[in-house]
Every structure is written in structure tokens, then in C-alpha cells.
């Protein structure tokens, strides 16, 4: 009887419930009843309006089975749901989807790993279904939170933990695919969701044992690796997420990366950080690259007070990002990037200078901090170099001017970098760092004319005396000049100072000097000669300085030299030889021999370049004589570790020196204008010499004049019986000495105007005129305006003359006039 009652009751139940009940076997181990499942599917397709009821009833049964821990029936219910979901594609499926998502949520909330994985797999299948019309009211907040939590699973069993994490990553991937394609439903890009999704993916990517350090875009992993390795699957999902990011939501996807790296202290060491940003730069669209760079710069500003290693790690990440971004779109904020980098460079130098001034207390710690700051500085310079070298020429010239404007130059206020707290040591350090940055930016820069590469606004501060106070500064200045002068890649052939037997073997590339280059040398040639001349006479020069000076002379000869410039360069070389022999600057014997070797190497080079046989013969003869009698005058010997130096140079034979008269005779026979060779080269005096802290060349010239004047014998014979008193000595010094000095000055001026080239005289007159103009302007600024007059002041308004009187009670009288 009870059985009949049940049969009667079941017959009264709705058909969809009977069909649903029939798919469940008595023993869950038998699995889904396929025949009844086909009937249920056919019924759902035939009557789509019943889908919501079928889904609700399945959800009811599944919830009951989950509570009662009937895992077998749960598996059957989810399998049936999946089949119905895949078979039905209509508008009526939307209510069914709500029931489906409710059942998936029930499985994810359960504490059993198998059910969580089962729910995730069903959600992934659902995510791959393309709906005809998306449902905008549907939200996935719960699934984002739950899948993110599964990505951080800490299950005691490693296999189960890995399985749960893989399920969480696949779930996040499903959410992304389901929502990210719909532009009208952008909730997934909101910060509260990205703050969960991105760290969850990075947490699993962090488990990669060996971080990929390839420069190119990494190859896509295989399907087997994705299914078995959480790190590989997380990286694939991260790439997919970034690849779908647009202009408006790019920052929301990148900022959680910084938070994760900060929280887990992954900037030092920064291998994982570099790996992450390589993935970001290669995954996003090229036109959005500059957004990522701006975010890195902003984070660098925010962490400016952190340890040097953390800042260095961020800058190295920026370097990798810039190296990738520079190949595509860089964006309009190039100067902002360089400005931020230079600001952090100054900050690093300032911190280094402050640490070095703390004294010997904690010297080990201070030394360690200094080394860390050097890491920061090198990272900044490399980043500037990579960024600058990939810019187009028009932008690179702007960056060159921008960096040069930051270089502190003594006596001028043109630089825009705050160095008030750096001190002398810090200022020198920032000069070196900026010049190193400039060197990297100018590397590979090719300008059609030298005027474009070295404009006056760039050349003047570059050749400033302030950048000659240290041998390293001078090296960097010369290297920057070489980058800009060497337009035919000849510098590598000239590397190393040596006597070249046959210059033709070097296969020097050169072109005919254009009119713009000739004009440049007429205007700035004396400035270049002066820099080389003074650079050779510095006491702290090392071998590299002489090599770079030799290369400078050779490059000027190749790129900029016509007949007049060749004569000027030979004059300069002879003047250097004379300065080494006379030794007015009290240089050491090594430096004097180094100058002699430099002159020999250059005259050997220029004689073969202009191919005048008599000149080549004279140079070769002097070099042969030096090889036999004075090898320390040749670069191959003087720059060796152990070289015997002479005690003096005054007693040497004239055959060891290059003689002006023989050079003039040889060049004159070939049509060169050699009148200027007989005029000794004297570097022009500039205004910067008067402002510089270094010993001015004016002082050197005045000392020479004093020595000469004192050595000239007096024509007047003083009587032995003359009374010698203090007043007499004072009078003799005031009259006789001054007269001799005036005579000598007049003689030098007359000789200069008779023999010196017009360009040199014009340059000196121009510098004096500029100095006079500046002094006059200062005097006019200090001039006090006269007091107002009661009669008024004359003003012109709209073409009419008017007087504006000043009331007496408003006038200010001197105190002595008031009683």
C-alpha cells in the first residue's frame, strides 16, 4: 500500500521534477543515467521556459546533498548542470544561469577541496560560453574574492594545495574572460577587484624557481605546463589580463604590482620585480608603455626615503621597462622622465656626501652606504643612457641640452639643479654623474653638421674651466666631444696614443669640409684649442687623458680641418712642446714627457693626413732620433709601467724636437700660408677665467711678464756712492719696475696686432666688450633714482605729453633739510 501511495504521488509531480529525479541513480557510484539525461535535455530544449524551474530544482537538490555530504550525488548534479548549460542557448538561459552560479557558489563555500575544484571547473566551462546578450546586472564579486582566496591556499597536503591554487587561478582566468571583453561592464577593473586578482597571480608566479631573464618576449608555455604548474598558469593569466587592459584601466592593473612588491620586500633583490615588469611591458599594447613608465617614476618618488638598494632595484626595473618601451612608443613626457631621474641622481649624491661627512665613526657602515649609493647612481646613468640612445635625433638634442643645463658650472647660475647642500665634493660628484649620463645619451648620435651637434649654448658650459678641475671630469668632457665630433666612426681606429707607421692602413673615412663646419671653426676653434692646451698642462693627468687629447686633435683634423685649421693645430702642437721644455707650470718629468709624446703622435698623424713629403720627412726623422736617443719622448715608452725618465730637458739636442722653421719651410713649399706658424700660440682669455676658482691664465701671463721685466738690465747705472734708503728703494720699485712693465706690455700688444690671426684678436676683444657691458649693467642697476620734483615728471600717454606733479607733503626730504 505505501508503495502505491508513493507511485501516485510521484505521478502528480511536475514532469521536469520527474525528469530531474530520474537522472540520479539509486547508487551514486553508477553515475549519471545517460538515457534519462537525454530526455531531460530534450525537454529543456523543447520547453526553454522550464529552464529556470529545472535549475532551481537542481540547485535545491545539490544544496541538500552538499549539507548531507553526499559527494556522489553532488558530482551527478553538476554534470547534469554542465550538460544543460552547454546544450541550451536562448534568452531563457539567463534565469537558469543564476541558479547555476548559486550552485557553484555553494561548492566554493564548502570546505572540501574536491567540491571547490568541481565548482571551479563548472565555472570555467560557463565562462567559455559566449552569450548573445550579456547580463549587466550580474556581478562576480563573490567569485573574485573566493578564487583569490583559493590562490593563497595553505593546505597541509602539498598536492591538494597545488590543486586548489590551480583551481583558483583558473577561476580568476574565467572571471577575466567572462567580464573583460564587455566594455559596458567594467567592474572587474575596479581597484577593489584588481587589488585581489593581481596579488593572487603574483603570489603564485613568485614560486618560479628560476626567473626568466631573457631580454626578448618569453615564449608561451605549453598546455601541460599550464595545467600542472601554478606559476606558469598564473603568468599566463597575468599576461591575458594585461593584454586586455585599455587606456582607462591600465593604472588599476599596474598599481597592485607595486603594493605586492613593497609588501613582500621584493625590490632587493629585484629579479622577480624585473621579471614582472618585463611581462607587463611585453603584454600591454605598445602605445600604453609610457603609462607604466610614469607609474614606476611615481613609485620611485614615493620611495625616495627608502634604502639605496630598494631605490636601485626600482631604477633597474625602470631601466628594463625603458629598454622595452623605447622600441615602440615612448610618450610625450620624455623631459619628465629625465627630470625625475636627474632629481634622484642629485638626491643620491647628496646622501652620499652627507654620509661621507659624518667622519670615521661607523666607517664600515658609512662605506657600505656609499657603495649602495653608487649602485643607485650607476642605475640612474644606465637608465638615462638606454632611454636617450633610443630617442630620435631631434629629441636627443633636446635631452643633451637639458642635461647640460643641469651641470653645475662655477660662476654662473644657468644650471637648474639644486646643489646648495652638496659642498665641493658633492658638486664634483654630481658633475661626474651628469657628464656620464650625457656621455651615454650622446653615444651613437650623428649630426649632419657640427653646429647642430655642438651649438654655442652647449659647447660653452661643456668647455667651462669648472669642468677641468679633475682628471675624470676632463676625460668625460673629451669623450662627450668625441661622440659628437666623430660622424664617420673613426674613433675606434684612433684608440690608444701611438706612432702610426702608415695612417693609410687605418682607412680613415672623411668628407670634404662643408661651409657650416668651416664657420664653426672660425667661431669656436680658439675655444677648442684653448681647452686642449690647458688640458695637456694639468698636473693630475693620467695616460687616458693624453690618449683622449690625442684623439681630440685627430678628430678635429679629420672632421673639421681645412688648411687654416691645420696650421692652427700645428701651432698648438708646437706650443705644447715649448711649454713642456720651458716648464713654466712646474710639471713633473712624467707629464712633460707625456706632452712630448702626445705632440709626436699627433704630428706624425697630421703629417700623413695632409701628405706633404717634406713635412713627413722632418717628423719621421725626429721620431727616429728619439727612438735612438730619447725613447721617453715617444708614447710607446713613456706610458709603460717602468720607463726611465730624464733628469732634465734643457740639455737635449735640437734634433729631438720638432722645429718651427723646418715645418714652415716644408709646408710653405706646398702652398700653405705659413706666416701664422711664426706667431707663438697663446690661449685666449675668457670671462670664465676671471670667475673660476682655478688659477687663471691671466695670472700665468702676468707672472711671465714680471719675470721678463726683472731679467731686463737697466740702462741707468746707479752710482755706488748713492745713499740707499727705504724711500729710495720704494721709489725705484714704483718707477723703474712700472716703466719696464709698461714697455713690455706695449711691445706684446704691438707684436700681437702685427702677427696674431684676426680671429684670435676678435675673440679677445669680444670677451672684453662683454665683460665691460656686464660691469656697466651692474653699475646702472645700483644707481639710485633722483627724488621726485614738485614740478612733476614728464610722461607720454597716447601720444600726448603730460606732467604729473607730486604734492610737497608726499616728498621725502633728507633729515638735514627738515627742522
UniProtKB/Swiss-Prot annotation:
GO terms for molecular function: protein homodimerization activity. It is found in: Cell membrane; Cytoplasm, Cytosol. Palmitoylated at its N-terminus, anchoring the protein to the plasma membrane. Widely expressed. Expressed in neurons of the superior olivary complex of the auditory brainstem. Also expressed at lower levels in the cochlear nucleus, the lateral leminiscal nuclei and the inferior collicus. It is a lipid-anchor. It comes from the Eukaryota. InterPro entries: ARM-type_fold, EFR3-like_ARM, EFR3_Homologs. Induction: Expression is reduced in animals with impaired hearing. Keywords: Cell membrane, Cytoplasm, Lipoprotein, Membrane, Palmitate, Phosphoprotein. Belongs to the EFR3 family. Component of a complex required to localize phosphatidylinositol 4-kinase (PI4K) to the plasma membrane. The complex acts as a regulator of phosphatidylinositol 4-phosphate (PtdIns(4)P) synthesis. In the complex, EFR3A probably acts as the membrane-anchoring component. Also involved in responsiveness to G-protein-coupled receptors; it is however unclear whether this role is direct or indirect. Component of a phosphatidylinositol 4-kinase (PI4K) complex, composed of PI4KA, EFR3 (EFR3A or EFR3B), TTC7 (TTC7A or TTC7B) and HYCC (HYCC1 or HYCC2). This is Protein EFR3 homolog A.
Amino acid at each position: 500500500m505505501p508503495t502505491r501511495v508513493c507511485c501516485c504521488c510521484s505521478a502528480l509531480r511536475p514532469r521536469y521534477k520527474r525528469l530531474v529525479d530520474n537522472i540520479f541513480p539509486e547508487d551514486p557510484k553508477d553515475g549519471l543515467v545517460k538515457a534519462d539525461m537525454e530526455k531531460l535535455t530534450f525537454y529543456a530544449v523543447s520547453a526553454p521556459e522550464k529552464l529556470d524551474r529545472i535549475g532551481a530544482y537542481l540547485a535545491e537538490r545539490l544544496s541538500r546533498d552538499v549539507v548531507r555530504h553526499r559527494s556522489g550525488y553532488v558530482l551527478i548534479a553538476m554534470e547534469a548542470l554542465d550538460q544543460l548549460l552547454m546544450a541550451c542557448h536562448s534568452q531563457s538561459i539567463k534565469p537558469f544561469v543564476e541558479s547555476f552560479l548559486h550552485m557553484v557558489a555553494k561548492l566554493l563555500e564548502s570546505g572540501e577541496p574536491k567540491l571547490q575544484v568541481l565548482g571551479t571547473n563548472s565555472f570555467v566551462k560557463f565562462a567559455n560560453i559566449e552569450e548573445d546578450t550579456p547580463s549587466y546586472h550580474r556581478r562576480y564579486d563573490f567569485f573574485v574574492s573566493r578564487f583569490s582566496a583559493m590562490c593563497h591556499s595553505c593546505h597541509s597536503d602539498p598536492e591538494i594545495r597545488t590543486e586548489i591554487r590551480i583551481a583558483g587561478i583558473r577561476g580568476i582566468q574565467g572571471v577575466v574572460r567572462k567580464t573583460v571583453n564587455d566594455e559596458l561592464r567594467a567592474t572587474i577593473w575596479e581597484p577593489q577587484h584588481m587589488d585581489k586578482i593581481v596579488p593572487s597571480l603574483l603570489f603564485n608566479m613568485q614560486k618560479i624557481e628560476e626567473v626568466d631573464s631573457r631580454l626578448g618576449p618569453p615564449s608561451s608555455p605549453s598546455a601541460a605546463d599550464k595545467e600542472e604548474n601554478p606559476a606558469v598558469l598564473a603568468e599566463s593569466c597575468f599576461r591575458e589580463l594585461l593584454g586586455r587592459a585599455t587606456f582607462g584601466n591600465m593604472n588599476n592593473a599596474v598599481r597592485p604590482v607595486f603594493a605586492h612588491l613593497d609588501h613582500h620586500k621584493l625590490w632587493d633583490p629585484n629579479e622577480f620585480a624585473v621579471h614582472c615588469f618585463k611581462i607587463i611591458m611585453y603584454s600591454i599594447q605598445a602605445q600604453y608603455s609610457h603609462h607604466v613608465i610614469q607609474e614606476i617614476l611615481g613609485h620611485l618618488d614615493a620611495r625616495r626615503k627608502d634604502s639605496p638598494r630598494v631605490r636601485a632595484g626600482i631604477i633597474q626595473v625602470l631601466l628594463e621597462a625603458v629598454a622595452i618601451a623605447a622600441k615602440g612608443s615612448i610618450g610625450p613626457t620624455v623631459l619628465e622622465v629625465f627630470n625625475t631621474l636627474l632629481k634622484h641622481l642629485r638626491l643620491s649624491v647628496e646622501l652620499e656626501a652627507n654620509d661621507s661627512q659624518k667622519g670615521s665613526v661607523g666607517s664600515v657602515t658609512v662605506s657600505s652606504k656609499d657603495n649602495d649609493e653608487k649602485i643607485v647612481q650607476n642605475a640612474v646613468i644606465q637608465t638615462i643612457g638606454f632611454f636617450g640612445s633610443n630617442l630620435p635625433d631631434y629629441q636627443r638634442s633636446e635631452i643633451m641640452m637639458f642635461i647640460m643645463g643641469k651641470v653645475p658650472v662655477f660662476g654662473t647660475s644657468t644650471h637648474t639643479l639644486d646643489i646648495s647642500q652638496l659642498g665641493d665634493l658633492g658638486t664634483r660628484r654630481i658633475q661626474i654623474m651628469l657628464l656620464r649620463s650625457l656621455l651615454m645619451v650622446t653615444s651613437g648620435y650623428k649630426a649632419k653638421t657640427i653646429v647642430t651637434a655642438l651649438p654655442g649654448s652647449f659647447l660653452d658650459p661643456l668647455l667651462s674651466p669648472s669642468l677641468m678641475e679633475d682628471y675624470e671630469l676632463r676625460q668625460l668632457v673629451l669623450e662627450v666631444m668625441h661622440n659628437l665630433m666623430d660622424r664617420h666612426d673613426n674613433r675606434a681606429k684612433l684608440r690608444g696614443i701611438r706612432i702610426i707607421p702608415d695612417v693609410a692602413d687605418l682607412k680613415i673615412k672623411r668628407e670634404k669640409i662643408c661651409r657650416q663646419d668651416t664657420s664653426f671653426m672660425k667661431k669656436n676653434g680658439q675655444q677648442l684649442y684653448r681647452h686642449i692646451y690647458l688640458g695637456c698642462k694639468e698636473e693630475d693627468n693620467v695616460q687616458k687623458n693624453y690618449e683622449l687629447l690625442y684623439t681630440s686633435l685627430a678628430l678635429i683634423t679629420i672632421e673639421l680641418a681645412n688648411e687654416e685649421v691645420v696650421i692652427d693645430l700645428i701651432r698648438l702642437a708646437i706650443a705644447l712642446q715649448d711649454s713642456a721644455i720651458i716648464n713654466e707650470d712646474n710639471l713633473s718629468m712624467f707629464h712633460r714627457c707625456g706632452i712630448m709624446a702626445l705632440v709626436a703622435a699627433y704630428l706624425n698623424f697630421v703629417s700623413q693626413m695632409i701628405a706633404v713629403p717634406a713635412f713627413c720627412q722632418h717628423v719621421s726623422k725626429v721620431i727616429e732620433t728619439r727612438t735612438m736617443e730619447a725613447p721617453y719622448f715617444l708614447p710607446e715608452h713613456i706610458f709603460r709601467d717602468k720607463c726611465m725618465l730624464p733628469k732634465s730637458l734643457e740639455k737635449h739636442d735640437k734634433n729631438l724636437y720638432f722645429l718651427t722653421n723646418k715645418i714652415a719651410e716644408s709646408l710653405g713649399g706646398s702652398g700653405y700660408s705659413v706666416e701664422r706658424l711664426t706667431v707663438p700660440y697663446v690661449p685666449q682669455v675668457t670671462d670664465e677665467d676671471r670667475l673660476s676658482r682655478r688659477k687663471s691664465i691671466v695670472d700665468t701671463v702676468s707672472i711671465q711678464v714680471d719675470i721678463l721685466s726683472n731679467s731686463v738690465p737697466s740702462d741707468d747705472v746707479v752710482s755706488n756712492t748713492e745713499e740707499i734708503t727705504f724711500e729710495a728703494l720704494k721709489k725705484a720699485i714704483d718707477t723703474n719696475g712700472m716703466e719696464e712693465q709698461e714697455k713690455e706690455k706695449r711691445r706684446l700688444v704691438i707684436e700681437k696686432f702685427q702677427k696674431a690671426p684676426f680671429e684670435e684678436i676678435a675673440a679677445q676683444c669680444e670677451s672684453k666688450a662683454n665683460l665691460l657691458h656686464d660691469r656697466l649693467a651692474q653699475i646702472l642697476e645700483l644707481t639710485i633714482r633722483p627724488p621726485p620734483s614738485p614740478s612733476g615728471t614728464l610722461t607720454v600717454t597716447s601720444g600726448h605729453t603730460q606732467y604729473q606733479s607730486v604734492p610737497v607733503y608726499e616728498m621725502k626730504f633728507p633729515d638735514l633739510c627738515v627742522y
